[in-house]
A protein has these predicted regions:
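Compositionally biased linear targeting/interaction segments
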Residues: 2-7, 16-455
């Protein structure tokens, strides 16, 4: 009644309209606040989902590490290198998560998609054992940096390097990890990682082809290791037969399949080399030297393979730094050959010949004698390598570079493990989180994940 008496109907309507506008603004404000917080909760929900997926990926990696340990226990016996067809390596389901083992194909130099499997550490050069003569022939390395590596690991400084500006002193002790190379004087990303910044063995679209070669130029991280160690005894702990000190009975027992006459001929030849009637005897330098000698005495490759895992030329408990010729990369082989004073052209030709032979004759790689079959008894490369103990066909350390994702391809994680089976059961020597390097599974894996999650 007061509204009607004081202002009339028009004044009352104006008052009611003002209230309506205020109410509308209040409603708009409340709705905006509600939408804002709802949007914030959507982001929080996504973040929580990603965290959950990440936890699932972490657990998938833990499960994958156990799986790899079991695979090594079953297949990496007596120095054998497990084949990626013997166990699952790609998109292996662990609940709603999946994992991959990012490997390297030893017979393919220019992969366009990641190769899945274990990485044989025995296929690499050991930073603590290989000389400057070998290191300097690796691509993307300078002779100065090769000297710096020797200086870092040596008990006494080999060269005079000023680490003052870097804020630390040289170690003057063996390398404990490959990543320790980052601390060596003169190290650069280009030298250590090459063009493979995410270290998956593939030139990805996000990585720059610096020299426009169309191929990946890998760095030292892919070519060196610190873990290789090969037992010089049988798996049950019994000793191998040292051919440099073996008796007639031991040699004849090893080569039983040759027959009595051939056994005697071989023993006579071995004894004449070790203990000639005149002059100084010559010990066998390594397994390749002994294999070459046996081949020249008419022993077949199969005949030598039957005894290869039972003989040695050393009294050391372990061999350190020998390279597995069955899995070594082309660049590593070339560096090894040139380090043994083989000329570059011959080294490159021999390396390619060995890789081709490996691809065409995968069942003939049981002993070191296959190198002689591939290159020939009179090869200058074989002769040079026989002067030392550089090569083997056995491996006991393997890297498992495990990447995993949770449901819908979320929560990407990546961890690298180094496994050692030289003392029997597999054990983990080293663990490194590589998630910071970004996606390493290639475009095809991403497309497959997206396709499956949108079906």
């Amino acid at each position: 009644m007061g509204c009607l008496m004081s202002n009339g109907p028009a004044g009352c309507r104006r008052s009611q309209g003002s209230v309506l506008i205020i109410v509308l603004w209040v409603c708009i404000g409340l709705v905006s606040i509600a939408l804002y917080f709802a949007n914030q909760m959507t982001y929080e929900l996504r973040a929580a989902d990603n965290r959950t997926s990440g936890v699932m990926a972490d657990q998938a990696i833990e499960g994958a590490a156990r799986y790899v340990g079991l695979a090594l226990q079953n297949y990496a016996t007596n120095g054998a290198t497990p084949d990626n067809t013997q166990f699952k390596c790609e998109a292996v389901a662990v609940g709603d998560a999946k994992f991959w083992l990012i490997g390297r194909n030893p017979n393919e130099g220019n992969a366009t998609e990641p190769y899945y499997g274990l990485v044989d550490e025995g296929a690499k050069l050991n930073l603590n054992n290989v000389s400057t003569n070998v290191f300097q022939y690796l691509p993307n390395i300078t002779s100065d940096f090769a000297d710096a590596i020797m200086d870092w690991r040596g008990t006494n400084g080999v060269v005079s390097l000023d680490y003052t500006s870097l804020g630390y002193a040289p170690k003057y002790a063996p390398f404990e990890t490959v990543d320790e190379l980052r601390l060596v004087y003169g190290a650069t990303v280009a030298m250590l990682a090459g063009e493979d910044l995410n270290r998956n063995g593939v030139l990805d679209a996000t990585e720059k082809d610096v020299n426009s070669s169309g191929e990946l130029d890998a760095g030292l991280f892919d070519q060196v290791t610190v873990y290789t160690r090969e037992p010089n005894f049988h798996a049950d702990g019994t000793t191998l037969t040292n051919v440099n000190t073996a008796t007639e009975g031991q040699i004849k027992s090893l080569f039983q399949t040759l027959g009595t006459s051939r056994q005697q001929q071989l023993w006579t030849a071995i004894n004449n080399r070790l203990h000639p009637p005149r002059g100084q005897g010559q010990n066998f330098n390594g397994s390749l030297d002994f294999a070459l000698f046996c081949k020249n005495q008419g022993v077949s490759s199969d005949g030598f393979a039957a005894v290869a895992n039972s003989v040695t030329t050393s009294t050391n408990t372990y061999f350190r730094g020998r390279v597995n010729v069955n899995t070594a990369h082309y660049d590593v082989l070339v560096a090894m050959f040139m380090g043994a004073n083989v000329d570059e052209a011959s080294a490159e030709s021999a390396a390619q010949t060995l890789i081709s032979y490996r691809q065409q004759n995968p069942s003939n790689l049981g002993s070191i004698a296959w190198i002689i079959d591939a290159l020939g008894n009179n090869s200058s490369v074989v002769t040079a390598l026989a002067r030392g103990n550089y090569l083997t066909t056995r491996s006991y350390q393997f890297a498992a570079d495990i990447a995993a994702v949770g449901p819908f391809g979320r929560g990407y994680r990546r961890v690298k493990f180094i496994f050692d089976v030289s003392d029997g059961p597999p054990k983990i020597l080293y663990r490194q989180d590589l998630s910071r390097l970004g996606w390493a599974l290639g475009e095809k894996a991403r497309e497959n994940l997206v396709a499956k999650d949108t079906q």
